């Protein structure tokens, strides 16, 4: 009997459908087609989402800056390394030691990352521009601070800005060490600065600074390096979906004018599917005197050396350099 009723209902539905106008038939067909498309897409989405949860154990190794600082890395960048007290310390001392004047100072932040330094400078009343060679970093900066100025640019390209464009230039958080040609960097900064302008650069004692990233310091304001018999060079952090590990390696015998001598290798392991992503940061870590001699050779004058120990960055410094008037 159920089959008979089904056939009877189907015939009834067909008779009703056959008596409708051509327009109604078209609309019924269109609605049916849309339902089919939606059901197909829904199934596809569910399959793709499910497949991402399967164990794939893929391995990726990145050494290029644009590949390292991709959308994923940028999304967790603050969780790994951001420390507001350090940023405030850097900007505060820049203001203190470099004669900054609200609205008249025009600052370039090289290696602006996700934009926090530019935001802080703007909050203090200064004009500021951030540049970075990572498209993902620039996109994130513009998304977070849409009212501020960020550009995808390389500090080693002298044509990026006109001569005498800025009163101040900053280069914080190891940015300078990613550059092989430091002479060109200082030449470009000299060209872009106004006469009497200031350049603030972050330099470290490469043999003693703490390579543990902020996220991996379980003691917060106390560095475990002070109590370790041997320098700690590894960091391990567990996030919700990823395990993070990093290891710093320094080779002092390498000529940094030719090749990198320091490496920070980061490993991200996806807890759910076993995927592994590795980043190898290649750094040209010349000594502080070597770098300062390059700066002096293009005409810079060293004005101040600021110890960052106050913000828990032992053996790290901000140097304030000045272009002659």
Residue map of PLM features:
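A short glycine-rich, Lys/Arg-flanked "PGG" loop and its adjoining helix->strand segment in the class I
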Residues: 183-195
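SAM-dependent methyltransferase
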Residues: 203-292
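A short acidic, Gly/Pro-enriched loop at the edge of an enzyme's catalytic core
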Residues: 160-169
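Conserved beta-strand signature within the Rossmann-like core of class I S-adenosyl-L-methionine
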Residues: 196-203
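Class I SAM-dependent methyltransferase SAM/SAH-binding core
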Residues: 115-158
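C-terminal lobe and adjacent flexible extensions of AdoMet/dcAdoMet transferase-like proteins
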Residues: 282-325
